[in-house]
Curated annotation (Swiss-Prot):
Taxonomy, superkingdom: Bacteria
Gene: comC
Protein name, as recorded: Competence-stimulating peptide
Keyword field: Competence, Pheromone, Secreted
Pfam families documented for this protein: ComC
InterPro entries (UniProt xref): Competence_ComC
Organism of derivation: Streptococcus mitis (strain B6)
Length: 40
């Protein structure tokens, strides 16, 4: 259950970063990072 909470916090943090940048630059590394996070 701890992993779910961490994931929610991680996604919320990424959303804030995306809102700040508002560009496609973050999407590519963010997607790769999310896939890596999902494997665990």
């Amino acid at each position: 259950m701890k992993n779910t909470v961490k994931l929610e916090q991680f996604v919320a943090l990424k959303e804030k970063e995306l809102q700040k940048i508002k560009g496609g630059e973050m999407r590519k590394p963010d997607g790769a990072l999310f896939n890596l996070f999902r494997r665990r």
